[in-house]
Amino acid sequence: MKRTTYILIGLFVAGFCMLVGGMFVMYCLGKPYFSNQINLQGEQLVQELPTCRVIWMTQTEMNTEERGIWLANSLLGVLPSKGEKNTFSCSEKVNEYLKMTVMGDTLKIVLDYSLIDFPQEFKASKYVGMITGDMQLNLTSKVECVINDIYMQKIALKKLTKDSISIDTPNSIMVDSCDFRALSVIRGGRNVEFQSGNINNLHLNLNRMNNWSVNVEECHIDTEYLTGQNASVQLQKGECRRMFWIPEKDDSKLKVTLTEKACVTVME
């Protein structure tokens, strides 16, 4: 085989690897791999929210047989309120498509982007990306649960001090510089990261989350309560003082890999 043939084959393989690698990276970042984008970023608008125990963020369906909108990865920051009111901030353009309703003790915030509003220049496109930019919730002590069903929007809990709070989302979660007596992760997405802070009681439903990790140097957990059907975990050195396994069924199993002496208790 001639040297030029080897070179051509090498270039082809290299190009193919770069294409596949680029698509994989963009998938991991949660960003669309198409060029058409609806940009809703812009100046931030801050508004007060009514008193509630639960805040539920969601979106309307943005896909039909003709076209679909891919929400590019964004961040929902959850921080403490500086006053006695809950507040929410997002770009002015995003706010135009938000609908808020109160249902009992739950505030529902819906990103309602109708395909009727689809830009004319994208009418021929099968898929279009939407960039919403980051959003932020500032919570009072009365909020006990945050649910986020906005596609691929990561939740970052920062500098929160609360007696207890529950997080329910199919997206990634990060906990940074928080102090909780009890934190419950009802659902968690691709990555749940406990970066720093203090958590007395951590409740995790392993059936409804993928990977989770603890930075043992900066995040201090007293007791972990793990529930599920069949799961496997590695208990890091210094990760927590006690671990409880709460099986969902009689035949549920938990495989624990220990890196030091630890107390693991099965609760019936």
Show which residues each predicted segment covers:
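Intrinsically disordered, low-complexity terminal regions
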Residues: 1-168, 172-176, 185-186, 194-195, ...
